[in-house]
């Protein structure tokens, strides 16, 4: 029987979703992106070759897998055109494998200009966005003034609506931010170029996915960012502009929630965060520097260094609740190789009391101090191990403690960047 699996991040993004999605795509008929935009970077490593994707789903490197961009994604024509060009240069027939919802809002140059002007104006209070226009594009969607992929079917109407929208946004840029305005002609030219090249990829995504399910095809729903960047459930205001939690898989694709069968949550064996915002277990010492260096912790999209810290089980328990996590995938276990001691955050010290639940308020979370459980590390290398029993005893005890204190079983463990460097204890698709 066909099975629909959702893959989401349980931290602040960068957990390794791209690798897991790529690994599981040989079991599915389609991979669906359901939220976010080209602010997300998913890194795939196959036989040592690295591919970084931002909009195209991570199944694109597999033959016979349909890659679908759902309505919850805000789509930059220029970014998608560049990504498709890059893939085709590498011999990947991206257009043969890709479908796009007509309901995707477009991210256009004036969104980028607004995003960057705002961050500049905020100064030290900047959110730390990627500056790629994602927030302003989602704002236009909610304000019901967005231009969508499907609007390009009528070029005259699109041009007229674009002129009206740009009058508004250029007024804000010029008169509020004292920034340069954006050229209407250049934006229109870019949008029409996208239509000319890729309009054949546009399809009714909910009907397509329903058809695949009737045909008995497995589907994988690929989340972007992570649970605590969710606009509602994250560390607001240091969040992204979309719902990154599993519920968005339904609204961002058009699949009914009853048809989502299980949710795999991904977390690193430690924790990272890019940009501003509370991070209770952050390590600003030699151990944090070691994790960053060993884990090559630089953003795939922004190339900004990631902040590193110990795994936060208080946060992980909350992520499991708000996503209905069925099982966990632990990534970058090998990064912990060689450390003499490891720590797991099991509670917080807040307002002179011990707190076992993560506060949603960012100001409160900043004041939370981690309470750690110490465990022995291991000196052996775990890189490339594919059998659980081959892991060092201390590594197995570490994983078992994560299972015990999170309340969620671990089904998959990543021991390196390559697709093959993985331990699969239980397959989400039952294969």
UniProtKB/Swiss-Prot annotation:
Domain of life: Bacteria
Cofactor binding summary note: Binds 1 Mg(2+) ion per subunit.
Reactions performed catalytically: IMP + L-aspartate + GTP = N(6)-(1,2-dicarboxyethyl)-AMP + GDP + phosphate + 2 H(+)
Any one Gene Ontology molecular-function term assigned to this protein's record: adenylosuccinate synthase activity
GO cellular component: cytoplasm
Keyword Ligase part of the UniProt annotation: yes
Binding positions for substrate per the UniProt entry: 300-306
One GO term of the biological process aspect: 'de novo' AMP biosynthetic process
Positions annotated as active site in the UniProt record: 14 (proton acceptor), 42 (proton donor)
Entry keyword set: Cytoplasm, GTP-binding, Ligase, Magnesium, Metal-binding, Nucleotide-binding, Purine biosynthesis
Residues annotated to bind Mg(2+): 14, 41
Entry cofactors: Mg(2+)
Chain residues that bind IMP: 14-17, 39-42, 130, 144, 225, 240, 304
Entry keyword DNA repair: no
Pathway given in the UniProt record: Purine metabolism; AMP biosynthesis via de novo pathway; AMP from IMP: step 1/2
Subcellular localization(s) per the UniProt record: Cytoplasm
EC numbers for this chain: 6.3.4.4
Binding, GTP: 13-19, 41-43, 306, 332-334, 414-416
Function: Plays an important role in the de novo pathway of purine nucleotide biosynthesis. Catalyzes the first committed step in the biosynthesis of AMP from IMP.
Quaternary state and interactors: Homodimer.
HAMAP family the record matches: Adenylosucc_synth
Family membership: Belongs to the adenylosuccinate synthetase family.
The name this protein goes by in its record: Adenylosuccinate synthetase
